[in-house]
Amino acid sequence: MLVVSFKFLKGAKAKMELLDRVLEFYSIKNSSVVKELLLRFMKLVLEKNKHFNLTAIENEDEFVIKHIADSLSLIRFLQNSDGKLVRAVDIGSGFGVPGIPVKIAKPSISLVLNDSNKKKCNFMNEAKDHLGLSGIEVVCQRAEELGKEVEFRESFDFAFARAVDKLNVLCEYALPLLKIGGAFLAQKGFECEDELESAKNAIAMLGGEIEKIEKFTLPESDEKRSIIVIRKLRQTPIEFPRKTKQIIKKPLS
């Protein structure tokens, strides 16, 4: 006879209710399907995390807020004014965040997950197959190399990154990948003004312009975030992105 503890059932129910409230906050369509896929993704990440380091977060509630809710904050930006299919790239995706939660919640987008770590790329491929996601490609390559390839350069409507690199460094990775009219969505902490000021010249050099900063608190939490929207207005000069050592040692300023 199967015996399931009341404590386990109560914990599982609370977890699902938390995710329900997050999905409701973001007005996610087909929420029951989305919820199931997000829970399966979380379970897979936390299981694999026991064997090799994917995330420092091991608590499920914390995962829902800091990985899922944080990722879904991008959804409202991901639409083209002409109604055409959105093509997006997640730079430095790691184990697939924010890209995979975004793809689950907005399956119509065409998405490239980019990371240079082979183990993490292998995991992302496993995750997309496990979840049955289509219209998603994992590219295991340095972001600056991606920006030099004809297939990817100036081909995306949106780029996003949750990496800890400074904004001027991230912009050199992201802006060469964007079409003119495309946007880089940089996920940052609440206090980002100094970093933004330091990146203004770099953004202009790369063909971009700061469109807006949105500050907000993640649902069901006190976690404060910013999304910096940088619009690409001009073609990026061919010399960008530079090689990794140059980008790190002498960031654009």
Swiss-Prot record:
<feature type="binding site">
    <location>
        <begin position="143"/>
        <end position="144"/>
    </location>
    <ligand>
        <name>S-adenosyl-L-methionine</name>
    </ligand>
</feature>
<comment type="similarity">
    <text>Belongs to the methyltransferase superfamily. RNA methyltransferase RsmG family.</text>
</comment>
<dbReference type="InterPro" id="IPR003682">
    <property type="entry name" value="rRNA_ssu_MeTfrase_G"/>
</dbReference>
<dbReference type="Pfam" id="PF02527">
    <property type="entry name" value="GidB"/>
</dbReference>
<feature type="binding site">
    <location>
        <position position="92"/>
    </location>
    <ligand>
        <name>S-adenosyl-L-methionine</name>
    </ligand>
</feature>
<feature type="binding site">
    <location>
        <position position="162"/>
    </location>
    <ligand>
        <name>S-adenosyl-L-methionine</name>
    </ligand>
</feature>
<dbReference type="GO" id="GO:0005829">
    <property type="term" value="C:cytosol"/>
</dbReference>
<protein>
    <recommendedName>
        <fullName>Ribosomal RNA small subunit methyltransferase G</fullName>
        <ecNumber>2.1.1.-</ecNumber>
    </recommendedName>
</protein>
<dbReference type="GO" id="GO:0070043">
    <property type="term" value="F:rRNA (guanine-N7-)-methyltransferase activity"/>
</dbReference>
<keyword id="KW-0698">rRNA processing</keyword>
<keyword id="KW-0949">S-adenosyl-L-methionine</keyword>
<comment type="function">
    <text>Specifically methylates the N7 position of a guanine in 16S rRNA.</text>
</comment>
<keyword id="KW-0489">Methyltransferase</keyword>
<keyword id="KW-0808">Transferase</keyword>
<keyword id="KW-0963">Cytoplasm</keyword>
<dbReference type="InterPro" id="IPR029063">
    <property type="entry name" value="SAM-dependent_MTases_sf"/>
</dbReference>
